[in-house]
């Protein structure tokens, strides 16, 4: 197998490859662009006009998605997966991946859409580099631009695999993309309603790609992801890469749960208190009248919505950041 097929090994070792461009036996081009960044270009006769960005490891301890991308890269390098799409593989936060930690200094997935300009340090620099890599990759016009940013969650979830669909002014959510997610094993999608500061929010809002954050189970160390079943997603990505995917049918979205953001819970001070157990699962239902959180100055978050559920509760975020999201069932 080509040396560039071992992108994860190179990244974990912090090494640059001797050869930064290699060709597979059938002419597929592998190009090491930067640490943790590999661009795959199919031979011209097979190119189907799709540009697919696959990122993982924005949080360094979320290893199941990293392992998934590593398997895909190795198949491409070995010639068993023959791309028809251009693919950019990104391991987002190499130093955090090496340490096995969520992040080193700052949560990188809060540093996109210009937020890195307000910060400093390794994660801010890397977020800017990832934006640049994505911008160059998606600069070819008249092509399909698609981005999946793969994650696992700090906690368990009542809905194991779900997606977050960013928002941008004047754009509608795509039914065919929702159908593609459903076919890949995604059980629910959260339709966001304002600009975000995540990697997928950047590629969706600034670069015009169809982009999603995929939450795929609970975060575990390398080699301990047997309970995270990514078989359907992996097969769907292989079909996207080799161009043999059937066009998803967006006319019916049976089996896919849709949610919208009702409110974000923002932590304003060190006095913030979230009235949930530490092990509460994502998508836990909360009854109207429930006192969810309190903060300085008598600020209270009381559940008013019928059918409300909580996702990403985290009272340990920095002041000014989101400590949870209340979501409610939605329709397109």
UniProtKB/Swiss-Prot annotation:
Membrane-crossing segments per the record: none
Record-listed E.C. numbers: 3.5.1.96
Chemical reaction(s) catalysed: N-succinyl-L-glutamate + H2O = L-glutamate + succinate
Cofactor field: Zn(2+)
Cofactor notes: Binds 1 zinc ion per subunit.
GO biological process, one term: arginine catabolic process to glutamate
Record keyword Hydrolase present: yes
Binding residues for Zn(2+): 59, 62, 151
Active site (catalytic residues): 215
Task performed by this protein: Transforms N(2)-succinylglutamate into succinate and glutamate.
HAMAP family tied to this protein: Arg_catab_AstE
Protein name: Succinylglutamate desuccinylase
Gene: astE
């Amino acid at each position: 197998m080509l040396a560039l097929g071992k992108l994860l090994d190179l990244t974990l070792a912090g090494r640059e490859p001797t050869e930064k461009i290699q060709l597979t036996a059938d002419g597929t081009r592998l190009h090491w662009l930067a640490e943790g960044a590999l661009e795959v270009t199919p031979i011209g006769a097979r190119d189907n006009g799709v540009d697919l960005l696959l990122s993982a490891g924005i949080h360094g301890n979320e290893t199941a998605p990293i392992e998934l991308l590593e398997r895909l890269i190795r198949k491409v390098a070995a010639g068993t997966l023959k791309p028809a799409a251009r693919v950019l593989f990104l391991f987002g936060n190499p130093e955090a991946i090496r340490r096995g930690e969520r992040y080193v200094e700052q949560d990188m997935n809060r540093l996109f859409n210009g937020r890195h300009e307000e910060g400093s340090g390794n994660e801010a620099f890397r977020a800017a580099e990832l934006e640049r890599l994505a911008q160059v990759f998606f600069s070819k016009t008249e092509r399909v631009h698609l981005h999946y940013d793969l994650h696992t969650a700090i906690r368990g979830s009542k809905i194991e695999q779900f997606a977050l669909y960013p928002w941008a002014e004047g754009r509608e959510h795509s039914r065919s993309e929702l159908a593609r997610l459903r076919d890949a094993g995604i059980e629910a999608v959260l339709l966001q309603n304002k600009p975000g500061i995540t990697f997928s929010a950047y590629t969706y809002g600034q670069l015009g790609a169809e982009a999603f954050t995929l939450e795929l189970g609970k975060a575990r160390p390398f080699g301990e992801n047997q309970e995270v079943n990514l078989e359907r997603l992996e097969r769907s990505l292989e079909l996207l890469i080799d161009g043999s995917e059937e066009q998803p049918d967006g006319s019916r979205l049976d089996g896919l749960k849709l949610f919208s953001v009702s409110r974000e819970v923002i932590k304003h001070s060190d006095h913030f208190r979230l009235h949930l157990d530490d092990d509460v699962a994502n998508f836990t239902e909360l009854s109207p009248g429930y006192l969810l959180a309190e903060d300085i100055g008598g600020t209270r978050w009381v559940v008013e919505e019928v059918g409300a559920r909580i996702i990403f509760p985290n009272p340990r975020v920095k002041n000014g950041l989101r400590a949870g999201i209340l979501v409610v069932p939605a329709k397109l």
